[in-house]
Amino acid sequence: IAIKMLDMGYNAVVLRYSLAPVTYPAQLFEAAYTMKYVRDNAAEWDVDPDKIIIAGFSAGGHVAGLLGTGWNSKRLDYLLENVLHCSHEYVKPDGMLLGYPVITSGIDAHRASFERSLGEKYDEFIDEVSIEKRVDKDTPPAFIWHTCEDKTVPLENSLLMVEALRKQEIPFDYHVYAKGTHGLGLGTRETATKNMGHYEPQVSSWTECFKQWMGVMYE
């Protein structure tokens, strides 16, 4: 996906975020650090510091959502003041790209994702990390896509996110495809499995839709 973004004319930075035994809020901290790192190097890398989108797919979508909805949270106060030495606004994404994202810790949760990110702190933080409950008027715009047939991370996850964005009047594009399992990536041969699983040509249109959304929102 990062290579596809480069091909489309965007810069791409990949974060390999931590999982158990390293637990939340490490993922939020790592996302914030990465946002600062990109902005710090924006001039050298030819990046527009006002058009930085945080992207994530499946559990990665949850990490993207953590920063998109938590850049202004007190959870980041110590890190920003004493380690990164920057403001909350400096680590705010300008937008979010969420593909078949893990959003809710409620009835439609993908429990395994939360077990890996929370570890022994599961009971302590499970309510705090339900992304749809964190959306506020300062949450950045979002491009979201999902499939009806996703049995791993149910469609209800993105539906809850869209509903939360709508209530706060945050702009979003939302694309739901009729066919396709979880983890499709680009939906093309490049991200298909050896037996051509995860090959869904109709889903591959999401990249062009994303490009159009970028043009509308940020150019």
List the model feature ranges, each with a label:
Residues 6-16, 53, 173:
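A fold-wide structural signal in alpha/beta-hydrolase
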Residues 1-2, 13-49, 200-202:
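Catalytic nucleophile-loop/oxyanion-hole region of alpha/beta-hydrolase
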Residues 159-219:
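C-terminal catalytic histidine-bearing segment of alpha/beta-hydrolase fold enzymes
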Residues 151-160:
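Conserved alpha/beta-hydrolase "acid-adjacent" motif
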Residues 131-139, 156:
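Conserved serine/cysteine hydrolase catalytic core
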Residues 33-113, 122, 126-127:
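Primarily recognizes the serine-hydrolase "nucleophile elbow" in alpha/beta-hydrolase
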Residues 148-151, 179-181:
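Acidic beta-to-alpha connecting loop that harbors the catalytic carboxylate
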Residues 138, 143-146, 150:
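Short beta-strand/loop motif that positions the catalytic acidic residue
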